[in-house]
Amino acid sequence: MIYIKNPNEIQKIKNAAQIYKKIVKQFNFDYIKNKSLKEIDQMLRDFVSQHHANSCYHGYLGFKGYHCLSLNQTIIHGLANDEIFTSKDKLTIDIGIELDNYYCDSAFTILGPDVNPRQKLLSEVTHNCIFELVKKIVPNQTTTNDLGIWTEEYAKKYGYSVIKDFGGHGCGIKIHEDPIILNYGTKKSSELLTPNMVICIEPMFFEKDNRYYIDPDDSWSVKPVNKNQYVCHWEHMVLIKEDQAEILTL
């Protein structure tokens, strides 16, 4: 079901997004360097709790962590473990926040200062893809299929590929709502983007080919079959307005 939000609901969603923006500011490399993913997960949980909100991924479909922490070869859905985040690493932090029964869902990638330049470029391109899509959105004209086509075209400009079975979605009243927003075009389903929809746009890029598997050790972490490459994921919540789109998590 697609939820068209009213002004009060939009404000509640923005309130949740404010907590996310504070996390992005606080959780930089220097703040979490040389800590384990489990420690970072707990730090995030504490931060969210201090703002009278909940980390809503915990228990969702059986997820045992509180946030998705995707280190290096994990592109999405990383489950916190004892691995240490160092200066040579990429870490994507995907956060679901519930505040007063409204939700924010967004993800950002932190790069250590000694990360490979290829990983740095991939992260920049993945993040910039969202900005390019948001600029192109025309309410009551653009569709979710357009977003998928534009995402894959943008990735291919740099020789990258997109994940095929995961993507963005509606959000706000529930953590995951319709419509599904794939990272590629499909004729199977396409929804018009209309005012007062809130969606999550989340490009997930592979540096090379997009074959993947789910790590059997934790049954969550999505990783590339081809290990000789880098991967990256970014996500922003976007409000569709009357004449344009607005990023709520920036």
Curated annotation (Swiss-Prot):
SUPFAM superfamilies: Creatinase/aminopeptidase (SSF55920). The keyword Lipid biosynthesis does not apply. Its cofactor is Co(2+); Zn(2+); Mn(2+); Fe(2+). It is an enzyme of class 3 (hydrolase). Substrate binds at residues 77, 176. It catalyses: Release of N-terminal amino acids, preferentially methionine, from peptides and arylamides. One of its GO terms (cellular component) is cytosol. Belongs to the peptidase M24A family. Methionine aminopeptidase type 1 subfamily. This is Methionine aminopeptidase.
